[in-house]
Structure formats: structure tokens, C-alpha cells
Amino acid sequence: MRTLLVFLLLAIFVAVLIGNVQVEAACKEYWECGAFLFCIEGICVPMIG
């Protein structure tokens, strides 16, 4: 049970790291940003609200 919890936390941490890289990455088209991100003025922006 504890191993599963650690794995879950690690997966979330990695997802956040990847998300931060995507947000900082320059983009030309909206699909380059991945899920739940928009391309605004060449920057991947998280979709909030």
C-alpha cells in the first residue's frame, strides 16, 4: 500500500515537471502544447477556468 502511494506521488511530481517544461516551451500551433494547454503569443499557457 505504501509503495503504491509513493509511486503515485512520484508520478504526480514527474507530471508537474513535464508540465512546467511544456509551459516554458515556445509553440506555433495549439496542439504542440499538449492536453489542457493553449498556445497564446507563442507560449504554452495552462487552461484555467
Swiss-Prot record:
Reported tissue expression: Expressed in salivary glands. Highly expressed in the head, body and tail with a 2-3-fold higher expression in the head.
Name of this protein: Peptide HSTX-I
Similarity remark: Belongs to the annelide toxin family.
Signal peptide: 1-21
Propeptide residue span(s): 22-28
Superkingdom in the source lineage: Eukaryota
GO cellular component: extracellular region
Disulfide cross-links: 27-39, 33-44
The keyword Metal-binding is annotated on this UniProt entry: no
Keywords (A to Z) from UniProt: Amidation, Disulfide bond, Secreted, Signal
Localisation: Secreted
Miscellaneous remark of the record: Does not show effect on voltage-gated calcium channels, potassium channels, and tetrodotoxin-sensitive sodium channels. Does not show activity on Nav1.7/SCN9A, and shows very weak activity on cation channel TRPA1.
Metal-binding in keyword set: no
Main location: secreted
Main function: Leech salivary gland peptide with unknown function. It was originally described as exhibiting analgesic function by specifically inhibiting rodent Nav1.8/SCN10A and Nav1.9/SCN11A voltage-gated sodium channels, as well as showing analgesic activities in several mouse models. In a second study, the synthetic peptide has been shown as having very weak activity on Nav1.8/SCN10A at the highest concentration tested (90 uM) and as being only very modestly active at hNav1.9/SCN11A, with a modest peak current size reduction (~19%) at high concentrations (10 uM).
Isoleucine amide modified-residue sites: 48
